[in-house]
Amino acid sequence: MSASLSQLVHQLSARFNNQQQAFDNPPLYAHIVVNCRPLVHLLPGSLLIEQSYAMDPLKPYRIRVLRAQTRDEKLIIFSYSLSDEQKYWGSVYEPERMLKIEEKDLQAIEGCNYIVRKKNSNFIGEVEPGCRCLVDRKGVTTYIVSKFELTNKGEMRTLDRGHNPVTHEQLWGSLGGVFEFNRTTDFSKEIPYDWIEEWKK
Protein backbone atom coordinates (compact mmCIF):
# COMPACT_ATOMS: atom_id res chain seq x y z
CA MET A 1 0.00 0.00 0.00
CA SER A 2 2.88 2.38 0.78
CA ALA A 3 4.31 1.82 -2.70
CA SER A 4 0.92 2.68 -4.21
CA LEU A 5 0.71 5.84 -2.10
CA SER A 6 4.13 6.95 -3.28
CA GLN A 7 3.23 6.20 -6.90
CA LEU A 8 -0.05 8.13 -6.59
CA VAL A 9 1.67 11.24 -5.25
CA HIS A 10 4.36 11.01 -7.92
CA GLN A 11 1.76 10.83 -10.70
CA LEU A 12 -0.28 13.68 -9.22
CA SER A 13 2.71 16.01 -8.89
CA ALA A 14 2.54 17.70 -12.27
CA ARG A 15 1.12 20.42 -14.46
CA PHE A 16 -1.60 19.20 -16.80
CA ASN A 17 -3.63 20.83 -19.54
CA ASN A 18 -6.28 19.82 -22.06
CA GLN A 19 -5.05 22.09 -24.85
CA GLN A 20 -5.59 19.59 -27.65
CA GLN A 21 -9.09 18.70 -26.52
CA ALA A 22 -10.04 22.37 -26.15
CA PHE A 23 -8.70 23.21 -29.62
CA ASP A 24 -10.50 20.25 -31.18
CA ASN A 25 -13.84 20.94 -29.45
CA PRO A 26 -14.00 24.62 -28.45
CA PRO A 27 -17.78 24.74 -27.93
CA LEU A 28 -17.66 21.88 -25.42
CA TYR A 29 -14.33 22.22 -23.61
CA ALA A 30 -12.61 25.24 -22.12
CA HIS A 31 -8.80 25.25 -22.14
CA ILE A 32 -7.89 24.43 -18.53
CA VAL A 33 -4.60 24.15 -16.68
CA VAL A 34 -4.27 22.02 -13.54
CA ASN A 35 -1.22 22.47 -11.32
CA CYS A 36 -0.59 20.01 -8.50
CA ARG A 37 2.62 20.67 -6.62
CA PRO A 38 4.10 19.20 -3.39
CA LEU A 39 3.86 21.33 -0.25
CA VAL A 40 7.24 20.13 0.90
CA HIS A 41 7.08 21.68 4.38
CA LEU A 42 3.76 20.12 5.38
CA LEU A 43 2.79 16.54 6.22
CA PRO A 44 3.70 13.81 3.71
CA GLY A 45 1.37 13.64 0.73
CA SER A 46 0.36 17.33 0.90
CA LEU A 47 -0.17 18.99 -2.48
CA LEU A 48 -1.40 22.39 -3.56
CA ILE A 49 -3.78 22.15 -6.50
CA GLU A 50 -4.91 25.08 -8.63
CA GLN A 51 -7.34 24.78 -11.54
CA SER A 52 -7.55 27.76 -13.85
CA TYR A 53 -8.48 28.79 -17.35
CA ALA A 54 -5.40 28.95 -19.56
CA MET A 55 -6.13 32.57 -20.49
CA ASP A 56 -5.87 33.61 -16.82
CA PRO A 57 -3.65 31.09 -14.99
CA LEU A 58 -2.96 33.30 -11.96
CA LYS A 59 -6.64 33.49 -11.01
CA PRO A 60 -7.69 29.90 -10.32
CA TYR A 61 -11.37 29.09 -10.15
CA ARG A 62 -10.48 26.37 -7.64
CA ILE A 63 -7.61 26.14 -5.18
CA ARG A 64 -7.28 23.37 -2.61
CA VAL A 65 -4.79 21.47 -0.53
CA LEU A 66 -4.91 17.72 -1.10
CA ARG A 67 -3.36 15.19 1.23
CA ALA A 68 -2.89 11.62 0.02
CA GLN A 69 -2.77 9.08 2.84
CA THR A 70 -3.66 5.49 3.66
CA ARG A 71 -6.46 4.72 6.11
CA ASP A 72 -7.63 1.21 6.92
CA GLU A 73 -5.75 -0.17 3.93
CA LYS A 74 -7.40 2.33 1.61
CA LEU A 75 -5.91 5.15 -0.44
CA ILE A 76 -7.67 8.40 0.39
CA ILE A 77 -7.07 11.95 -0.84
CA PHE A 78 -8.29 14.36 1.83
CA SER A 79 -9.48 17.78 0.65
CA TYR A 80 -8.87 21.08 2.43
CA SER A 81 -9.83 24.65 1.69
CA LEU A 82 -7.50 27.54 2.49
CA SER A 83 -8.41 30.43 4.72
CA ASP A 84 -7.89 33.64 2.74
CA GLU A 85 -7.35 31.54 -0.38
CA GLN A 86 -7.01 34.52 -2.71
CA LYS A 87 -3.75 35.31 -0.92
CA TYR A 88 -2.27 32.16 -2.48
CA TRP A 89 -3.64 32.44 -6.01
CA GLY A 90 -0.91 31.65 -8.52
CA SER A 91 1.54 30.43 -5.90
CA VAL A 92 2.03 27.15 -7.79
CA TYR A 93 4.15 29.28 -10.13
CA GLU A 94 6.12 30.74 -7.20
CA PRO A 95 7.12 27.90 -4.83
CA GLU A 96 8.48 30.33 -2.24
CA ARG A 97 4.92 31.57 -1.71
CA MET A 98 3.72 28.02 -1.20
CA LEU A 99 6.02 27.79 1.82
CA LYS A 100 3.87 30.38 3.58
CA ILE A 101 0.93 27.99 3.76
CA GLU A 102 0.63 26.61 7.30
CA GLU A 103 -1.38 23.78 8.80
CA LYS A 104 -3.54 26.33 10.61
CA ASP A 105 -4.63 27.70 7.20
CA LEU A 106 -6.23 24.37 6.23
CA GLN A 107 -9.91 23.62 6.75
CA ALA A 108 -11.16 20.10 6.07
CA ILE A 109 -13.97 19.99 3.50
CA GLU A 110 -16.62 17.58 4.71
CA GLY A 111 -17.72 14.94 2.25
CA CYS A 112 -15.18 15.90 -0.43
CA ASN A 113 -12.46 13.31 0.09
CA TYR A 114 -11.55 10.96 -2.75
CA ILE A 115 -11.49 7.19 -2.39
CA VAL A 116 -8.77 5.93 -4.71
CA ARG A 117 -8.16 2.46 -6.10
CA LYS A 118 -5.33 1.19 -8.22
CA LYS A 119 -6.09 -0.56 -11.49
CA ASN A 120 -2.95 -1.98 -13.08
CA SER A 121 -0.64 1.08 -13.21
CA ASN A 122 -3.49 3.59 -13.16
CA PHE A 123 -5.33 5.25 -10.28
CA ILE A 124 -9.08 5.85 -10.25
CA GLY A 125 -10.58 8.17 -7.66
CA GLU A 126 -14.15 9.12 -6.80
CA VAL A 127 -15.57 11.55 -4.25
CA GLU A 128 -16.80 9.61 -1.23
CA PRO A 129 -20.47 8.56 -1.41
CA GLY A 130 -23.27 10.38 0.35
CA CYS A 131 -23.83 13.52 -1.78
CA ARG A 132 -22.19 15.62 0.96
CA CYS A 133 -19.57 17.48 -1.09
CA LEU A 134 -21.45 20.76 -1.37
CA VAL A 135 -20.43 23.69 -3.55
CA ASP A 136 -22.16 27.00 -4.20
CA ARG A 137 -22.30 27.70 -7.92
CA LYS A 138 -23.77 31.03 -9.01
CA GLY A 139 -25.63 31.30 -5.74
CA VAL A 140 -27.07 27.79 -5.91
CA THR A 141 -26.01 24.97 -3.57
CA THR A 142 -25.07 21.79 -5.41
CA TYR A 143 -23.33 18.55 -4.56
CA ILE A 144 -20.42 17.35 -6.66
CA VAL A 145 -20.03 14.00 -8.35
CA SER A 146 -16.35 13.91 -9.22
CA LYS A 147 -14.11 11.24 -10.71
CA PHE A 148 -10.56 11.13 -12.02
CA GLU A 149 -8.18 8.66 -13.59
CA LEU A 150 -4.40 9.00 -13.61
CA THR A 151 -2.26 6.92 -15.94
CA ASN A 152 1.43 6.13 -15.78
CA LYS A 153 1.77 7.79 -19.20
CA GLY A 154 1.13 11.27 -17.81
CA GLU A 155 -2.55 11.40 -18.70
CA MET A 156 -5.37 12.51 -16.44
CA ARG A 157 -9.07 12.22 -17.14
CA THR A 158 -11.60 14.04 -14.97
CA LEU A 159 -15.35 14.45 -14.75
CA ASP A 160 -17.00 16.95 -12.38
CA ARG A 161 -20.74 17.53 -12.28
CA GLY A 162 -22.96 19.47 -9.90
CA HIS A 163 -26.40 18.21 -8.91
CA ASN A 164 -29.42 19.57 -7.07
CA PRO A 165 -29.35 18.10 -3.51
CA VAL A 166 -33.12 17.52 -3.56
CA THR A 167 -33.98 16.47 -7.12
CA HIS A 168 -30.48 15.19 -8.06
CA GLU A 169 -30.86 16.95 -11.41
CA GLN A 170 -27.54 17.88 -13.03
CA LEU A 171 -27.13 21.66 -12.88
CA TRP A 172 -23.60 22.16 -14.16
CA GLY A 173 -20.61 20.29 -15.48
CA SER A 174 -19.22 18.94 -18.71
CA LEU A 175 -21.78 18.35 -21.43
CA GLY A 176 -19.27 16.72 -23.72
CA GLY A 177 -18.03 14.14 -21.23
CA VAL A 178 -14.63 13.54 -19.71
CA PHE A 179 -11.90 16.20 -19.70
CA GLU A 180 -8.65 14.75 -21.07
CA PHE A 181 -5.45 16.26 -19.72
CA ASN A 182 -1.81 15.61 -20.52
CA ARG A 183 1.16 16.24 -18.26
CA THR A 184 3.29 19.15 -19.47
CA THR A 185 5.56 19.62 -16.43
CA ASP A 186 6.67 16.99 -13.93
CA PHE A 187 6.96 18.18 -10.31
CA SER A 188 7.63 14.75 -8.80
CA LYS A 189 11.31 15.52 -8.25
CA GLU A 190 10.18 18.05 -5.64
CA ILE A 191 8.76 15.30 -3.42
CA PRO A 192 10.89 15.32 -0.24
CA TYR A 193 13.06 12.33 0.52
CA ASP A 194 11.65 12.13 4.04
CA TRP A 195 8.14 11.63 2.63
CA ILE A 196 9.36 8.63 0.66
CA GLU A 197 11.11 7.23 3.74
CA GLU A 198 7.97 7.76 5.83
CA TRP A 199 5.89 5.84 3.30
CA LYS A 200 8.28 2.89 3.52
CA LYS A 201 7.62 2.41 7.25
From Swiss-Prot:
Key words of the record: Lyase, Organellar chromatophore, Plastid
Enzyme Commission no: 4.-.-.-
Organism superkingdom: Eukaryota
Annotated Gene Ontology cellular component terms: organellar chromatophore; plastid
Compartments where found: Plastid, Organellar chromatophore
A Pfam family reported for this protein in Swiss-Prot or TrEMBL: CpeT
Membrane-spanning segments: none
Molecular function GO labels: lyase activity
Signal peptide: none
Function according to Swiss-Prot or TrEMBL: Covalently attaches a chromophore to Cys residue(s) of phycobiliproteins.
Similarity field: Belongs to the CpcT/CpeT biliprotein lyase family.
Protein name from the UniProt record: Chromophore lyase CpcT/CpeT
Source organism per UniProt: Paulinella chromatophora
